[in-house]
Amino acid sequence: MKLNRISYVLAGALLLGAPAVAQETVPAAPAAPAAPAAPVAPEAPAVPVAPEAPAVPSAPAKAAPVAAKGAAVKDVNDIAGATAVLAKCDQNHNYFQDQQIKTDMVLNGGVHKNVKYSFDTYTRGSKRSVRFDDPPEMRGMGVVTKGRDEVYARLPDSNKVRRVGTHAKRQSFYGSDWSMDDMSMIYFEQDYAVAKVISLDDNGHYTFELKLKNGVDLPYPKLIVKITRDTLLMDYIEYYDDTLSLKKTQERFDLKDIGSGHQVYTHVRVTDAATKHTTDNYVKSEKINQNFPEDTFTKRWLVRSL
């Protein structure tokens, strides 16, 4: 197959007594001599006691979600609170020093019917690298994002590593609903400001409208995001283009621990608003804090697979 377009798969990715104090023993005072015992009256017959009612078990206490501490929105005018929630959400999704995930990507719609790709994604901070291992014609293809303006790709049809231009970053990759720009959207609060609090409790979610910050080069001037109130994790995104028309949606499902000790969304679906074409990412495994070499985010890393 020939590759004409470049994009990225966003996997994913996210969002758990004090010792007893010894008492000092004080010696007891000597007891006073006992007074002579008074005659004891005969005991009255014992009154039968009704049997004790069985104890009603108490409901287990529900622990407050750790993730929600320190960030909340008081009312629809609380933009500062919403901004704090968005920043905490970013933190909850990026809880690692570095991360490696294995993902299967499935395309459906138009000419695609259950077309499947498999790849590994490596992330550290704002850097991200991807390497495909299946199907065979995609094996060795890779993408390295060192920053929003420095992206390199290795294309199987050319066997060369090339720097990706701005126009190419906005295009689809091999028919998927992801783009290279999507790959760089890791910390939302860095790129977007909260423009409006749409809802404080939409089925257990905060709903915010986000506006692209000045000077940020992304093709989505507006986003609508939903963040769970209990765990402060983002599980729904709407992307709007320059005409403020809905471009696509992203939904995240199946939050669970798959090996790192943290919960991540293991199924992510992106849907094109116009064509209804879908791309489903299934995260198969996750490893964190492996301290893999910084070389993972360089052109040399891509060249090694040639």
Spans of features found by a protein language model:
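N-terminal, post-signal-peptide region of Sec/Tat-exported proteins
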Residues: 97-127
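N-terminal propeptides/low-complexity segments immediately following signal peptides
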Residues: 23-61
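Flexible, processing/modification-adjacent segments and terminal tails
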Residues: 62, 68-88, 94-97, 104, ...
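Sec/Tat signal peptide C-region and signal peptidase I cleavage site
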Residues: 18-22
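Bacterial N-terminal signal peptides
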Residues: 8-17
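Functional cores of ribonucleases/endoribonucleases
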Residues: 129-145
